[in-house]
């Protein structure tokens, strides 16, 4: 039928009809896919920026940790050095000879740096005292010392001081008068009889 109409129109000398313009409406799938692709692209760029910032933070934290580790290593080296020094000092102190004993023996009981006062002779002990006294006076003094007992002689350890209660215990009668108490045996017999 269309071919017939075209033939009639051509025979009459009419012009060919212009083709109908069809509006290009995008398909729903194309719209959805475009929006999806655009959203995913933006999301990927955002995630990429966040990951980059995270990597930068991790790199900074690693540098700080390395610095702290080096500082800790220095401190541990110092501690080890101090410990070795203390151990060596203890060994030296324990193995070193004691010099104080030698000083005491050399100075007859005095410390090495102590001053010694010059010994002054007591009066009467020197040569002048012995020469100035008469031998007869010395014999008289010896006799007087023998006759007079020395008050500074210590008493024997068996001689105990008199007790303050010695007079009371050495008296004629008892200290306390006996009370009139019933005999215990009589009380026991009376108790058995009552049973």
Swiss-Prot record:
Residues 98-175 are annotated as: Disordered. Residues 39-68 form a coiled coil. Pfam families: DUF4677. Residues 135-146 have a biased composition (Acidic residues). GO terms for cellular component: cytoplasm. Keywords: Coiled coil. It comes from the Eukaryota. This is Coiled-coil domain-containing protein 184.
């Amino acid at each position: 039928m269309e071919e017939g109409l075209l033939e009639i129109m051509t025979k009459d000398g009419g012009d060919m009809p212009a083709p109908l313009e069809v509006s290009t409406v995008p398909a729903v799938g194309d719209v959805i896919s475009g929006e999806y692709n655009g959203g995913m692209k933006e999301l990927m760029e955002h995630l990429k920026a966040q990951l980059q910032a995270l990597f930068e933070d991790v790199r900074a934290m690693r540098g700080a940790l390395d610095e702290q580790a080096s500082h800790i290593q220095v401190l541990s080296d110092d501690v080890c050095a101090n410990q070795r020094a203390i151990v060596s000092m203890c060994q030296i102190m324990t193995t070193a000879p004691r010099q104080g004993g030698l000083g005491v023996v050399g100075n007859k009981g005095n410390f090495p740096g102590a001053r010694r006062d010059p010994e002054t002779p007591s009066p009467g002990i020197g040569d002048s005292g012995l020469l100035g006294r008469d031998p007869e006076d010395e014999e008289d003094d010896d006799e007087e010392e023998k006759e007079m007992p020395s008050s500074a002689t210590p008493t024997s350890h068996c001689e105990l001081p008199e007790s303050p209660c010695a007079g009371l215990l050495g008296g004629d009668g008892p200290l306390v008068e006996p009370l009139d108490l019933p005999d215990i045996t009589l009380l026991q017999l009376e108790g058995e009889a009552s049973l």
